[in-house]
Amino acid sequence: MDNGSCCLIEGEPISQVMPPLLILVFVLGALGNGIALCGFCFHMKTWKSSTIYLFNLAVADFLLMICLPLRTDYYLRRRHWIFGDIACRLVLFKLAMNRAGSIVFLTVVAVDRYFKVVHPHHMVNAISNRTAAATACVLWTLVILGTVYLLMESHLCVQGTLSSCESFIMESANGWHDVMFQLEFFLPLTIILFCSVNVVWSLRRRQQLTRQARMRRATRFIMVVASVFITCYLPSVLARLYFLWTVPTSACDPSVHTALHVTLSFTYLNSMLDPLVYYFSSPSLPKFYTKLTICSLKPKRPGRTKTRRSEEMPISNLCSKSSIDGANRSQRPSDGQWDLQVC
């Protein structure tokens, strides 16, 4: 990057706001997605196409966790990058790949639910797990091809003793990067809103024929997908559009820089909020989280007698009983069956 084409702003607001926010996202995101991946890998009884898409969404979110400690250090040093050019390229590439991957698989999850609810007999609902996995591989390939340009050139801006590492050049439009940034939002937004409206409308038309609990669960799920998407990605898109509209007068405006950095950090929130999508994806998953919490908090008393344990059978055997209950409910339609034997 031409050092003469960038301006370094050592803004106190950015240095104060960003580190706590990124640390919060890292802790909650790693915890939520780590538990989700554990459930997918070790406690999933049967896999379906929707399960495969959700698993890939969790993988995309977990990959972000690798980058957040380095970005946190960057902001703690008041936007001074000390890890070199190669690390800068890799981190920016992974951040962009996470954003694109999360958007793609959130959209696919919404489309999958749309076909299951609105067109239950469509051939898309009958695709095999192998086809769904191949689709996920194709989508990952497209995501990588769409973001690999960040590896092709340096993004370090050195002025004096300070070096910034940014994917956006704040002094001008960024060509392909801006095109991808806007397209990744508005095209999926259109698809997700279309799916959400049609799912809700279809469920309301059939509410007399469908069980109320299932209708509410499906409605909550699609609304959570739309809400997470808009909350995480709309602010940064609006901030970037404002910058492009006002450039060059806003090129080195500290308030514009602060707004863009803070709203860009909202895109990291998707890794913290996507566990809500997993939670509402299947009636079995909330029970998985509940049993996991109960089993982890249940006190262990090795000195109890056999009689005492017999008296406390409903509590101590909670997890093993849940597997029997889950078997009795296996005929219910769901997006994935979760093995609740987590104790």
UniProtKB/Swiss-Prot annotation:
Glycans are attached at N3. Residues 319-343 are annotated as: Disordered. Residues 1-21, 71-90, 153-182, 242-259 are extracellular. The chain crosses the membrane at residues 22-42, 50-70, 91-111, 132-152, 183-203, 221-241, 260-280. The keyword Transmembrane applies. One of its GO terms (biological process) is negative regulation of lipid catabolic process. Residues 43-49, 112-131, 204-220, 281-343 are cytoplasmic. It is found in: Cell membrane. Highly expressed in subcutaneous fat and omental fat and detectable in lower levels in brain and many other tissues. High levels detected in epididymal and subcutaneous fat with slightly lower in omental fat, low levels are detected in the brain, skeletal muscle, kidney, liver and the pancreas (at protein level). One of its GO terms (molecular function) is G protein-coupled receptor activity. InterPro entries: GPCR_Rhodpsn, GPCR_Rhodpsn_7TM, HCARs. PANTHER family: HYDROXYCARBOXYLIC ACID RECEPTOR 1, HYDROXYCARBOXYLIC ACID RECEPTOR 2. This is Hydroxycarboxylic acid receptor 1. It comes from Mus musculus.
